[in-house]
Amino acid sequence: ATGKEDLEFILDIARGIAEEARILDAQVIGGDLSRADQLVISITAFGEVDKPTTRRGAKVGDDVYLSNLTGWSAAGFNLLNKGLNLNSEEEIFAVAEHRSPSVDYDNGIEMAKKATSMCDVSDSIFIQGGQLAESSGVKLEIDGELIRTHPDFADLEKISVRVGVDVWQLIIGGGEDHAFLATGIDLPFFKIGTVVAGNGIELKKIPAVQPGWDHFKN
């Protein structure tokens, strides 16, 4: 911390960490404080898993699924960055998703039960979908026509027009979405593509996008 933060701000951070831990039935077991020019919060989580679902299991013929539509956090960032007034519930939701991301842990747990491979997409579908494809030795074909069928697509597209950023950039390259990407057969989630022979990620009926956040380049 910088030493300039007021006590209530610090307490709000502590309350937020405690609440998120409570949702997962986890315990906060320690920590330390140091002074720096900017506030940095670093958290390490430990746990046990009987049968991990990794990025390595995707097979040709699998389908590709999302736990929920991505792009809302990037939409919220652009609304804030451009200083726009929030004119709809959808815009309020987008800003909330950027400022305080929500994670559907139940969806993640259910996905992992039947998925052949799985990852989060907080750096973007383009980057982490590509990483999953590389780990599994396959190609992910992401289909824009499938994504358009999501019931929230039209609302997100309206925001994209207002902020002047292509909706596909928000969905595929935006990042900061706390959603899950998985491969498998007949998963009860939103299908966005298929697994085919090849490598990397291919966008079908989706214009070129900037890939998103790369920790080793940005």
Feature map (PLM): residue ranges:
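Short, conserved charged micro-motifs
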Residues: 52-53, 186-189
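Active-site-proximal betaalpha loop/short-helix elements
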Residues: 2-5, 79, 98-174
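Glycine-rich anion-binding loops of enzyme active sites
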Residues: 1-81, 194
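Acidic, Ser/Thr/Pro-rich beta/coil linker or hinge segments at domain junctions
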Residues: 101, 147-151, 188-218
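Short hydrophobic/aromatic beta-strand micro-patches
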Residues: 46, 181-185
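Active-site glycine-rich loop that binds ribose-phosphate moieties when present
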Residues: 44-54, 90-110, 163
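Short, surface-exposed beta-edge/turn micro-motifs
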Residues: 62-63, 177-180
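A structural signal for short secondary-structure junctions
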Residues: 163, 172-176, 185, 196-197
